[in-house]
Swiss-Prot record:
<keyword id="KW-0433">Leucine-rich repeat</keyword>
<keyword id="KW-0597">Phosphoprotein</keyword>
<dbReference type="InterPro" id="IPR001611">
    <property type="entry name" value="Leu-rich_rpt"/>
</dbReference>
<feature type="repeat" description="LRR 5">
    <location>
        <begin position="173"/>
        <end position="194"/>
    </location>
</feature>
<feature type="coiled-coil region">
    <location>
        <begin position="235"/>
        <end position="645"/>
    </location>
</feature>
<feature type="region of interest" description="Disordered">
    <location>
        <begin position="332"/>
        <end position="352"/>
    </location>
</feature>
<dbReference type="Pfam" id="PF13516">
    <property type="entry name" value="LRR_6"/>
</dbReference>
<feature type="repeat" description="LRR 6">
    <location>
        <begin position="201"/>
        <end position="223"/>
    </location>
</feature>
<feature type="repeat" description="LRR 4">
    <location>
        <begin position="145"/>
        <end position="166"/>
    </location>
</feature>
<keyword id="KW-0206">Cytoskeleton</keyword>
<dbReference type="GO" id="GO:0036064">
    <property type="term" value="C:ciliary basal body"/>
</dbReference>
<dbReference type="GO" id="GO:0005813">
    <property type="term" value="C:centrosome"/>
</dbReference>
<feature type="repeat" description="LRR 3">
    <location>
        <begin position="115"/>
        <end position="136"/>
    </location>
</feature>
<feature type="modified residue" description="Phosphoserine; by NEK2">
    <location>
        <position position="661"/>
    </location>
</feature>
<dbReference type="InterPro" id="IPR052116">
    <property type="entry name" value="Centro_Cilium_Assembly"/>
</dbReference>
<keyword id="KW-0175">Coiled coil</keyword>
<dbReference type="GO" id="GO:0005829">
    <property type="term" value="C:cytosol"/>
</dbReference>
Amino acid sequence: MEEFRRSYNRLCEESGAEPQEAVLQQLHQLPKGGLDLTTQSLTVETCRALGKLLHKETLLKELVLSDCMLSEEGSTLLFQGLCANTSVQHLDLKGNNLRATGAEALGKLLRQNKSIQSLTLEWNNLGTWEDAFATFCGGLAANSALRQLDLRNNQISHKGAEELALALKGNTTLQQLDLRWNNIGLLGGRALVNCLPSNRTLWKLDLAGNNIPGDILRAVEQAMDHNQDRLTAFRENQARTKILSKEVQHLQEEKSKQFLDLMETIDKQREEMARDSRASAVRVGQLQEALNERQSIINALKAKLQMTEAALALSEQKVRDLGELLVAGDQERQSLSQRHEKERKLERQEAADRESKLLRDLSAASEKNLLLRSQVDELERKARSQQEQLFLTKQELTNTSAELKIRAIQAEERLDVEKRRAKQNMEDLEKLHSKEVDHMTRHLEESERAMQERVQRLEALRLSLEEELSRMKAAVLSERGQAEEELIKARNQARLEEQHRLAHLEEKIRLLAQARDEAQGTCVQQKQMVAESQARVSQLNLQMEGQQRRLEELQQELINKDQEKVAEVARVRVELQEQMGRMQADLVAQEALREKVAALERQMKVIGSEHREALLDRESENASLREKLRLKEAEISRIRDEEAQRASFLQNAVLAYVQGSPLRALSPPK
């Protein structure tokens, strides 16, 4: 406030006037936020300086200028400074004898100032000049900040009340109006009553001491009560609305916090899922490689086992054939020995007879001996040819086994090619899956910018990712199944080809064995071959048992790996289900918040509808009261007209009586 005082001194010096000591003293004792110049006679220069100071002053809240006897020029200068002021809220101009110029300046002040809320104009003469007061009322109608107006003792007539009523129809902020001790009268009271239905903010109107009938005062009181009830309801509704808005804002903040927490949780879960998926992919790749290695080992062992089984079956068939040959040779030898014994007996019996014939038959026997020798030579040649044919058959069998091995190796190579192709397909599918995951991630980042649809889009994205993952898994499984089916088909085809070739070879061996039966000289060799075959069969049985044990161990390891893989998949599935459960719980909490907000909105709508119904009831009640008031006013006007007619009749009668009385003739002239 010291700055305010220095500015006042400077402005007075610039204008060439002496600062008023009383004003300086008040400025020195100036309380915080207020300036009280009550009963101080302010000069025009002081008013000019104060007007310039008030034009820029931002700390002054209250200005009291009561009983200062302001001149018209001084009041105009003060009001011009207050027009641009934005801090003064209470202005007291009591007892300043403001007239036409002051009323017009006040009208301009009310039209331009947006901060004054309380204006005291008691004991002035604003209503004496109707045009100036009309200007004041126009400023009041345009004002949107004034809450309290005191116009007591301002000589306001019924015309001024009519102008004031027009101003009240356009004003939407004035709440208290004091019009006591004026000259409003019946017509002014009616004008004010008629304007009250259009004004719903004025809840206090004092009209005492204005010669207004009691019914009009009661109507004014009813209107004020109605506005006060409306104001109370409005304040209650505003308080409820503020509480509800705070609650809604709090809920929105909580919702936003929860949503941010949910988004952070989802990001963390997404990162964890990405890490888990990468680790799972690495683990699956390692397991797949190990499985492929084990599968290749198993396939090699299976191929060896099949070859061993084929060799074993061939050896067993050879053993059976050789056994049959031995049995047939033994039977033939026994039959030959029996027949030889019979022949010897016959020869002994016929020895005597032969002795005589030997000499005769010697020449014939020698010839027969030569013939038999030639037959023996022929049989030996046949045996050698059979041995050569057997050697060729063995060589063909060796070539066939080598060809079978080559075909098995080719089948294994084709199997490896199919595995590599399946692995390449898996890698391509993983790359495609990673690209699709990147695309969906970018799509998720774009969709996160929309606050209202963020949860729904996130849910849809999660579902689509799960569906895509399930589809990719199904595709991988189907391709793996197809690869396994192709592998099985290739194995079956190779096995069928081997079986056909083995059957063909067995047929050849059977034919060769039947041809070999005719050779008697190979029995010892066949026995040796049987012994060797039995020893080889025992060795092959031992090797087969070892291979079976190895195969069982590999199968057990494969089962353990499958169990570990299933356990890992189950653990990942449980984690995903837990994450989905937490997300569903968050969604349920958000849905509860939405329901709570919807309930609050419904409650606000119910309160608004009740308020509207109450307003409609009050308006209907006001309409009925206005109708009753109109009827009462009509009746009162009729009674007043009758009373006026009676009074005029009585006055005429009295005048006629006075004019016709003898006392008038005796009265001296004036």
